Amino acid sequence: MEELEQGLLMQPWAWLQLAENSLLAKVFITKQGYALLVSDLQQVWHEQVDTSVVSQRAKELNKRLTAPPAAFLCHLDNLLRPLLKDAAHPSEATFSCDCVADALILRVRSELSGLPFYWNFHCMLASPSLVSQHLIRPLMGMSLALQCQVRELATLLHMKDLEIQDYQESGATLIRDRLKTEPFEENSFLEQFMIEKLPEACSIGDGKPFVMNLQDLYMAVTTQEVQVGQKHQGAGDPHTSNSASLQGIDSQCVNQPEQLVSSAPTLSAPEKESTGTSGPLQRPQLSKVKRKKPRGLFS
């Protein structure tokens, strides 16, 4: 199950708007099973299953359908991908959720080969270590990365001020007065930000701003966490290990026929090609920015 655990960690969060409420969710599906993490910003629920659980649950919920577990997993991936990846193209399935004691049940209803298809994700409260792995540690890493970014930008602004000062000392004057700026004072800027911008900037709401604006950074931080963990475990080259182990359903379900057999006579399902909810992940790459020459604001 290590593949599912690492694959889930490196997935972005998605924002789900259901009839009952809104949720944050991430999922990783392969031919061997799936892992799902869901949160309403109050609690976090988790489910991770293998093919044996998929097969048993499919029999209980869909008595008229018979298929290998991989076919059901591919179908679930096809249903979840529009919901998690592209809100502009809604899923053909209907989703609803219920909270029962410490469990959250995410119910799915759709059609498969002309017959109703049902699925229930049975998510239990996530362990503290799982919450730390997927939320606390990544969010701390993101905060440190953003702080470092702010310091780099402040340094760049100071360098720009020195450059402008050098132009002025050389006798240059500003042609357009509207472009005039005061020297950057970091402490004053931070104090003003705390007073004027902080309330709006840290408005969490239902979690949608976090999902819409920060997932690239989130995935970069979690990818780094996985690579560091692999180095500590002596797993060899993390790039090689990641590309081999985190293919997900893209590599395992391509050209996977559903091979469905119904209790109704002469019913067969068309073959489908599916790609994974979590395809091959592109690691963030940093490129050097070529500094541009001044455009002659001064003459």
Swiss-Prot record:
Annotated consequence of substituting R178A: Impaired ability to repair double-strand breaks (DSBs). Does not affect interaction with XRCC4. Does not affect ability to participate in V(D)J recombination
Residues under site feature: Leu-lock: L115
Other remarks in the entry: Was named 'Cernunnos' after the enigmatic Celtic god of hunting, the underworld and fertility.
Protein's name according to its UniProt entry: Non-homologous end-joining factor 1
Effect of S203D: In XLF-Asp mutant; phospho-mimetic mutant; abolished ability to bridge DNA
Phosphoserine modifications at: S132, S203, S245, S251, S263, S287
Compartment(s) of residence: Nucleus; Chromosome
Upper classification of the organism: Eukaryota, Metazoa, Chordata, Craniata, Vertebrata
Sequence segments annotated as region (Globular head): 1-135
Record annotation: effect of changing S263A: In 6A mutant; abolished phosphorylation; does not affect ability to repair double-strand breaks (DSBs), possibly because of redundancy with XRCC4 phosphorylation sites
Impact after mutating L179A: Impaired ability to repair double-strand breaks (DSBs). Does not affect interaction with XRCC4
UniProt-reported outcome of changing S251A: In 6A mutant; abolished phosphorylation; does not affect ability to repair double-strand breaks (DSBs), possibly because of redundancy with XRCC4 phosphorylation sites
Alphabetical list of Pfam families matching this protein: XLF (PF09302), XLF_CC (PF21928)
UniProt effect for mutating S245D: In XLF-Asp mutant; phospho-mimetic mutant; abolished ability to bridge DNA
Intervals of motif XLM: 289-299
